[in-house]
């Protein structure tokens, strides 16, 4: 048996390596994605002040700290038995839209773009962000950099810092939004809508008009029939910041819908000796190993997971593209892993549209941004992370 090691892996957040094992005929027998770093957050957070959790847990990741910060903040809301005022909820969600704008822009153009935009036949040394710039042009590169910065600026204005925000408090946030900052965010969010539309057009022109790409997306090699999980609002539309957790089966039927506080009734974790990452699965289905299908408890999250678990998008332009994706790829749910890139751009458009809605809300500059915490207890918080 022959072993091939790829270490380190590039184009991902964090550290990882891939181990591939070939049989005597030279065919792949097994392949493992290994996460070799021990993080230890679950241990060193024990005994710390609850109020420190949004700041400590945001250090889990430098790319998606907003998700960890906001999940921790929402856990404090329930732990201190306090409901934030509506203006505070809207400001939190607006900051969260900024996070999705910069994260989805980063992922599509920097991490996914080298394969789609540059092309799978390009030499490895060309499949990077510089190759994307060379293929798409310098003007496109400038727009990518600008709108990623816009997302970070929105996060910074509300969160206090673009990376590792510091605004979350039990019962609200640390400061209101000034009219001057509101106008700045409105301009950036409006521009982000146009950028998202442009990004989808680029995807249509380069990917969907190429028969080979579409065949690759639909191919069995990139198909996994799993359960899907996502956060949805009261109408089962995609929501990043709030709502219930919805799970659908591989054929699209609702399997479960529950509050964050009940997550341990539905989700368990499996441990393997070759990786430090725990492997969540649906408790009521059970762990059957690394297999797909309705009898396996494996489920997927992220952009495609959310779109499959929901019944639509809550903004008009994103809804149009949502319907087009399922029509093009043969109905719902879509099981193609490569469709994550299309779903990501649909969410980029939704985040931008939603940011415009929120920043134009008359309550967004209200000074009523925090309610007094109540008696302390236990709390669980959930948000949808971008990846």
Regions from the language model: what does each represent?
Residues 1-387:
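Active-site bordering "gate/hinge" segments
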